[in-house]
A protein has these predicted regions:
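Beta-strand-rich domain onsets/edges
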Residues: 23-38, 45
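Extracellular beta-sheet/turn segments enriched in Thr/Pro/Gly and aliphatic residues
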Residues: 26-32, 101-124
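Short, ordered, surface-exposed loop/turn motifs in non-cytosolic proteins
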Residues: 35-38, 46-60
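N-terminal regions that are enriched for targeting/export leaders
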Residues: 118-177, 184-187, 192, 197-225, ...
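Hydrophobic core segments of beta-strands in well-ordered, beta-rich domains
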Residues: 160-182, 232-257, 263
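Conserved small/polar residues in nucleotide/adenosyl-binding loops
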Residues: 272-274
Length: 274
């Protein structure tokens, strides 16, 4: 092979390589398009209200859980256009059994489609939704709804205390999980809400907490008292002092492993400094 022929061959290879990214980009249509999820809405058969925290499960154990708006984004491409059995379960809610005793429904999901599943309420209380934790509207947001909802930065938290104080509802939670590390907050976290926003009576639940936060925006500890172990608060109440000004007071406990209370007392929360 002459020098000229080798030079021309090398030039052809370089030209082909330079076009490779654009050739790969062309492969994105139409057979490699992203499959849109199918929207499943879980509703109370009697009221039509959305029902959060209902689990649907496929025959190969894919599980999806409805969010505060009762929505599920079923995003399994292999199920689109396929008759699919979904086991349906949720505390206090159910669907009728079939002849073999299975509680579920058969649906045909379609990309971008919508399916409604009605559940029967077996308990007295109607579930309104989760108040805390992450992803309250995660499924809805995957489907393009509730895009104005902002995450709190809290993954989950322990039992709640609350009290009315200076015209607002004050909330305090125990051990609180944060997204950045397995060890979160262990000296109570807290927030306030306007009284009118505190007790929603219609779903979906959207409580607008104003959390007490660190400068880096993570929820802060409310009651990091001296001594080993977590600090837990209970019995929150707003009381007038000698000067007539109301103070937020509580009982506190200090806890050592495994779960030993070694100190108990009363405290006044100075919310100005939190």
């Amino acid at each position: 092979m002459t020098f000229r022929a080798c030079f021309m061959l090398l030039g052809g290879l370089l030209s082909a390589l330079s076009r490779l990214p654009s050739l790969l980009a062309l492969d994105s249509s139409p057979n490699s398009q992203i499959v849109a999820p199918c929207e499943i809405r879980i509703v109370d058969r009697q009221t039509g209200w959305p029902v959060p925290m209902i689990e649907v499960e496929t025959t190969n154990q894919l599980k999806f859980v409805s969010d505060n708006a009762g929505r599920i984004a079923l995003d399994a491409p292999e199920l689109m256009g396929v008759a699919t059995w979904l086991n349906v379960r949720g505390h206090g809610y159910s669907v009728p059994k079939d002849g073999f005793g299975y509680r579920g429904v058969r649906v045909v999901p379609e990309a971008g489609g919508k399916i409604s599943i009605a559940v029967d309420r077996d308990q007295l209380a109607m579930r309104l939704g989760r108040l805390t934790g992450a992803g309250l509207f995660a499924e809805s947001q995957k489907l393009g709804y509730e895009l104005d909802w902002k995450e709190s930065g809290v993954m989950g938290c322990d039992s709640v205390q609350n009290a009315m104080h200076l015209g607002k509802r004050f909330w305090a939670w125990g051990d609180t999980n944060l997204p950045n590390y397995p060890l979160g907050r262990f000296h109570m976290t807290g927030a306030t809400t306007l009284h009118s926003d505190s007790l929603p009576v219609l779903p979906p639940v959207r409580v607008a907490y104003q959390y007490f936060r660190e400068p880096d925006t993570r929820p802060s500890n409310l009651a990091e008292f001296p001594g080993d172990g977590p600090t837990w608060l209970s019995g929150l109440v707003s009381l007038p002092g000698h000067d007539g000004a109301y103070k937020l007071v509580a009982s506190y406990s200090k806890i050592r492993p495994p779960m030993t209370e070694y100190e108990r007392g009363l405290c006044v929360l100075s919310l100005i400094h939190i």
